[in-house]
Every structure is written in structure tokens, then in C-alpha cells.
Amino acid sequence: MALKNFKPTSDGKRHQVAINYSELSNEGPERSLLAPLKRTGGRNNNGRMTVRHQGGGHKRRYRIIDFKRNKFDVPAKVARIEYDPNRTAFIALLHYADGEKSYILAPQRLQVGDTVVSAKTLDNVDVKPGNCMPLRVMPIGTIIHNVELKPGKGGQVARSAGNYIQLMGKEGKYAQLKMPSGEMRLVLLECMATVGMVSNPDNSNTKIGKAGRTRWMGKRPSVRGVVMNPVDHPHGGGEGRTSGGRHPVTPWGVPTKGKKTRSKTKASDRLIMRRRK
């Protein structure tokens, strides 16, 4: 999908680069697959802020996405490709042969009218974008997305716009996957994955253009610690402009900006063949 540039009719339009959504459906979403999305503003059940920089934004309804793809051997036709305000990727509405409807993440090159299917063997499914199958039946080198880490749990990785994972090899009961970060990881061969790359790869080339558009997305400003007072942040205070005077920390004094946060005893360490670069 192409990018769209704007004439500089205002400072907010001057540098804006947006996605051209002309190829997407302009019908409303499928009502049976919608759920309410309550806004929290970053507050918990006590009303206290637990996540900063959240609040405001346009009201949304959640689209129920089928990440498990466990309706096997029933072909489904792509009725339309839609915009989803809750994620960077586009979504595809499927009409199954038995009358059921569901949303899936739309892979690149999936078109309206295409047929997709989910299966356990290659007898009933081809290796083409949108089809879902276990890693054990996929050819080595296949580009995939929406990959499970535990069989039956549903896809957890490679779900955002333009992302993909490559199947590099198989050994024993594990598949060797090259993750979007460059990490090489072992995943059980029984885990399901969908063929293809996630749609909307140009999302990373967009420019928001103005602060107000970020507010429409529900994001509030992020204030630097060095411009706060000492009571508010460890970097605060000082006479005139200062650099903070110490290595970067969070408002609670925890090292940040490059400090490794992964647990040294994480069980999944044995499944990581090579760390990300």
C-alpha cells in the first residue's frame, strides 16, 4: 500500500507522511466481531496511575482477532481487508464455508476473494499467504508470521505491520526460527504459524506531522526528567540547565536506556540459540 504526501497547507501537514487507505474496505466493521474497549487513562482499579503517557484519544471498539486459527480443513473466503485502529497491521474478514465469520491478521499480497485454510497436514493446504499450518509441515526457508510459542495458545510473535519470521531449520522436536530482531530461537514443531509477511510494511515510513495527531492516538506527552524538580525525578533540579549528573534512571531510580532487564534465570534461555543484535 502506497504512502501519501500532503501539500504544506499548514505546519502540521508540511512533513506529514501517511498510509494511503484507498484499497481498504470503507464498510463498517463486522458487528458480531466487536467488543467494547474500556479506557483506563493508565489508571488501575484504585484510580492510581500505573502507566504513564496514556490518556485521551479517539474512542475505539476492539476487533476480535483469531490468533489461534484452529478451525481446521474448512476453507474461508476473504470478504474484505479492513483498517484496525488497535494495531498497525490490517485485518481480513473471513467468511467460512459453514457460515462462520472471523478476523485474521492480513498478510501481504492477500486479496479480496482469495481462499485461505488452516490445516494440520499439507494434504489440504498449500504454502501460500494466509494459510495456517504447524511448523513441522512447512518447507525450510518459508516466511511466516503470527507464530505460536506454545501449541494451542495462539500466535504471539511477528504480529505487527511488516513483520515476519523465517523458518531456518528443523532439529528433533524443535524448529529453528530467525526472529524479526535477528535472534535465533527454538520453537516446538507442533506450534502453528501463518504463511507470509504481515501487511502494511510502509507503516515504519510514516511521519505523524504534529503533536495533536499523537494525542488522537491516546498518547500523552513524555516529560524529560532533567526539566523536573528534585522531588519529581532523580535527574531533576540544579542551577540552570544540567545533564542530570548520573547515568540515566527512571523516576523510581532504576537504571534505564540500555540497562539489561531480562532475568538471568529465565527458563526460555535454553531455547535461544543466538541473541538479537
UniProtKB/Swiss-Prot annotation:
Keyword list (alphabetical) reads:
Ribonucleoprotein, Ribosomal protein, RNA-binding, rRNA-binding
InterPro entries, per database record = NA-bd_OB-fold, Rib_uL2_dom2, Ribosomal_uL2, Ribosomal_uL2_bac/org-type, Ribosomal_uL2_C, Ribosomal_uL2_CS, Ribosomal_uL2_dom3, Ribosomal_uL2_RNA-bd_dom
Q: Which Gene3D superfamilies match?
A: 2.30.30.30, Nucleic acid-binding proteins (2.40.50.140), Ribosomal protein L2, domain 3 (4.10.950.10)
Q: Name one GO cellular component term.
A: large ribosomal subunit
Q: Where is this region: Disordered?
A: 227-277
User: Coiled coil: which residue ranges?
Assistant: none
Q: Determine the domain of life of the protein's source.
A: Bacteria
UniProt KW DNA repair keyword = no
Q: Its GO biological process terms?
A: cytoplasmic translation
Which SUPFAM superfamilies does the record cross-reference, listed alphabetically?
Nucleic acid-binding proteins, Translation proteins SH3-like domain
Give the Basic and acidic residues compositional bias ranges. Answer: 266-277
- Single GO molecular-function term? rRNA binding
Any single Pfam family the record assigns to this protein: Ribosomal_L2
Q: What does this protein do?
A: One of the primary rRNA binding proteins. Required for association of the 30S and 50S subunits to form the 70S ribosome, for tRNA binding and peptide bond formation. It has been suggested to have peptidyltransferase activity; this is somewhat controversial. Makes several contacts with the 16S rRNA in the 70S ribosome.
Quaternary structure and interacting proteins, as annotated: Part of the 50S ribosomal subunit. Forms a bridge to the 30S subunit in the 70S ribosome.
What family is reported?
A: Belongs to the universal ribosomal protein uL2 family.
Give the matching PANTHER family: LARGE RIBOSOMAL SUBUNIT PROTEIN UL2M, RIBOSOMAL PROTEIN L2
Q: What is this protein called?
A: Large ribosomal subunit protein uL2
Q: What species was this sequence derived from?
A: Magnetococcus marinus (strain ATCC BAA-1437 / JCM 17883 / MC-1)
The gene name reads rplB
